[in-house]
Regions:
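Hydrophobic small-molecule pocket/channel-lining residues, especially in calycin-type beta-barrels
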Residues: 1, 22-25, 63
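Flexible extramembrane loops and terminal tails that flank transmembrane helices
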Residues: 1-19
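Residues immediately within or flanking Cys/His clusters that coordinate Zn2+
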Residues: 18-21, 35
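Short, cysteine/histidine-rich loop/knuckle motifs that typically chelate Zn2+
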Residues: 23-26, 37-43
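Short functional micro-motifs and their immediate structural scaffolds
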Residues: 32, 46-47
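Extended interfacial segments that mediate partner engagement and assembly in macromolecular machines
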Residues: 48-107
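OB-fold/S1-family single-stranded nucleic acid-binding modules
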Residues: 102, 117-139
Length: 139
């Protein structure tokens, strides 16, 4: 089972719960999750926090089937069978990975408009871990 230490878990709450990224003061690119050095210009370590919209489009995706998920997702796998995991290009630029929810795996498509919602990700040692999942955008 994957283990995330309590201090690391608490440090990443702004990214996991509120989609807070960092905007490079030199090149203006948005990094998510925030980095110590800009991953685009590699020259700046000065950033401003930026609230990401949570809106984007599916860049690519994969369907996770039985046996393909880490142990902490076994309960979800048993309950629902296959589930999609997508790399989404957010409106602000960064690409982020996350599970899809409320979407028939057969209907997930490249360029599909999605938004983020705070959802239960998994339970580890009796602690429920929350984070964002992507859902189809409402029209």
């Amino acid at each position: 089972m994957a283990h995330v230490s309590v201090p690391m878990y608490w440090r990443t709450i702004p990214q996991r719960y509120r989609l807070v990224g960092s905007k490079c003061k030199k090149c203006g690119s948005v990094n998510f999750p925030p980095k110590g050095v800009c991953k685009y210009c590699n020259a700046s370590s000065e950033f401003d926090d930026v609230q990401l919209s949570g809106r984007g489009k599916v860049h690519t995706f994969v369907l996770i089937s039985a046996g393909g998920a880490p142990p902490e997702f076994a309960e979800q796998e048993k309950a629902g069978g296959q589930y999609p995991v997508a790399i989404v290009q957010l409106e602000e630029g960064p690409k982020v990975i996350g599970q899809m929810a409320d979407a028939d795996p057969k209907e997930v498509k490249i360029d599909m408009a999605v938004t983020t919602e705070l959802r239960k990700i998994y339970t580890e040692e009796g602690v429920i871990r929350y984070g964002f999942k992507f859902v189809p955008a409402r029209k």
